[in-house]
Curated annotation (Swiss-Prot):
Belongs to the DEFL family. Protease inhibitor I18 (RTI/MTI-2) subfamily. It comes from the Eukaryota. CDD domains: Knot1 (cd00107). One of its GO terms (biological process) is killing of cells of another organism. This is Defensin-like protein 2. Disulfide bonds join C3-C47, C14-C34, C20-C41, C24-C43. Gene3D superfamilies: Knottin, scorpion toxin-like. PROSITE patterns: GAMMA_THIONIN. Pfam families: Gamma-thionin (PF00304). Keywords: Antimicrobial, Disulfide bond, Fungicide, Plant defense. Transmembrane segments: none annotated. SMART domains: Knot1.
Length: 48
């Protein structure tokens, strides 16, 4: 199962998945990508 949540530290519009993933990794997530019409950085990780 995959859990997803909005990044707490990402500021502004999310234009590059790589930037989002880097911030998510620093927050302890497994990665992340830009999502939705509002281009928010969403972090993902495995969860049970």
């Amino acid at each position: 199962r995959v859990c997803m949540g909005k990044s707490a530290g990402f500021k502004g519009l999310c234009m590059r998945d790589q930037n989002c993933a880097q911030v998510c990794l620093q927050e302890g997530w497994g990665g992340g990508n830009c999502d939705g019409v509002m281009r928010q950085c969403k972090c993902i990780r495995q969860c049970w």
